[in-house]
Amino acid sequence: MLNLCHALRGVRQFSCSVIVKVKCASCSIKLQDQDPSKPGYYTKPKSLPDSKLNPDLQDLKYLLFSQDIQLSKQAIQNDPDLKTKRDLLLRVICKRCSNALHHNNYNPEEFPESTLNDILNYVPRGSNVMHIVPFVEFPLHLDPNVLKRNDLDTTLVLTKSDQVFKDKNAVSKKVPIFMKQFLKNTLRIDSNKTFAISALKNWNISMFYNYFKNYTYLLGNPNVGKSTLINTLLQKYLGYKVKIDSTGKINSPSEEVMQEAFTNPKNFFKIQAAGVSHIPNLTRSVQAYQVGGKILFDLPGYSTSTSRLRLEEPIDERWLQRLRKTDLFNRKHIKQKTYESMKGTSQGGCYTVGGIFYLVPPKGSINQIVKYIPGPSKTFKNIEKGIDVFNSCNSSSGTHPLSRYCGIKSVICEKSQYKRYAIPPFIGSIEIVLKDIGYILLRTTGRYEFKGLHEIWIPRGIQVGIREPLENLIESGYRRYIETNGKESSCPRDRPIISSLYEMAPDEADTLNAVKKSYLEKTEKDLSARRFVDDDPYDLVQHLXKKKNPYWYYQW
């Protein structure tokens, strides 16, 4: 405590008038200490152990120790000559963020979702926008409404590419060519403004920096990698937070704060960094950053569906953290592609990761599964058995022998809480993508013979889709493009490569005909997308080598 007093000697008293002008260092909301029910609230201690402490040290003790103990201790040790209150204020976070980040104690209702229109209120017409989409979950998160806007100059940025590709060669050269042709063929968007990057691996970050213009906005769903990208740029180009007033004047940190960039760069970055968290919707207000000679704006994430399920409801807290913390992703699966085998059974044998989904292969099929979702997998005799086991796990408070395989809460331990989806016919391999969760590769082996449709059961409200294996699709397409000197597209034109799934009634027996019926309904206003509508479904699936991906259709 004596060291703290010495370090903070001469610092003037904090006041409410100062605090309300300061933003939370994590979520960028304005701080206030008047109303606990309103955003930005931070609390002061009700009583102090030492009444002799003067008010300024009381406030400082609270702000530095009550909210962010580890960060503040290190900051004081590394910066014993701290002289200004401004750099102390930059460390302050609101009560909501403090509880969520340091105690993992948060109410999802305090992290409200925003719509695209809500977020666009921050963005002036004609602005430069980077639409941030995690490539690992492509095509989920890709919003054509953003790319097609005439009042914005939009570039598509595909993040987390290290979770799809082995090295950055494909990311640098092959992805932009593929995406240009995909956007043109699929969405009728003629654009060559696409970047694939990995902020964690520093792939293409220099190229990205050289490309983006001054006053650029980062726009995307929650947890797509916006803040991680910003922090990578801040470290690489010695960036920092700035404030821009109503006249457009840029207010940079004080000289004392900027001096720390040279005397203690590690601590300087901690103060300036964007708030990165596994908690969605953490960012609540726009935050500007000076990155080199350019201004970059971090926008709150927006959601495209009001009916979307909050993953906090069905999924266990520890499992959810593993799903969302992308730095924990194990890249050995990308290089080795270790698979698990499973044979379809007459009882409806299923494969699951934590109960988050149940994959049911058709009877007699031999399948290989490569899992890119954290957590141990498990097979069960049928879905009912899996749900029954996980129900017992939730009732046993962790003592059940299979508790390590359980990633769901008791609220989802009923079959009625899941939706049944049929996967349209395919031959070879596909990737099944679950929004905000990850993906698995599914491969059927042996001589092709149609044995039925694969099914997947997923909690209601979770979005799912399929795609042809992305890495192989882009690699083979690039080879074809180069070998023909660009005459052939790197993105296939003879078939769709992505598709939504088809919801089935729990008792539907003829899933193939039900899929065709649903396909015709979904494409009623998109007749140009229809294929094989005159073929009998059961004749069609006998010739998948020639008539690929029947009934594949993605609803944007």
Swiss-Prot record:
Residues 1-21 form a transit peptide. It is found in: Mitochondrion. It comes from the Eukaryota. Keywords: Mitochondrion, Transit peptide. Residues 113-305 form the CP-type G domain. It holds the Pfam family MMR_HSR1. Interacts genetically with prohibitins and thus may be involved in the mitochondrial lipid metabolism. Belongs to the TRAFAC class YlqF/YawG GTPase family. GEP3 subfamily. This is Genetic interactor of prohibitins 3, mitochondrial. It comes from Saccharomyces cerevisiae (strain Zymaflore VL3) (Baker's yeast).
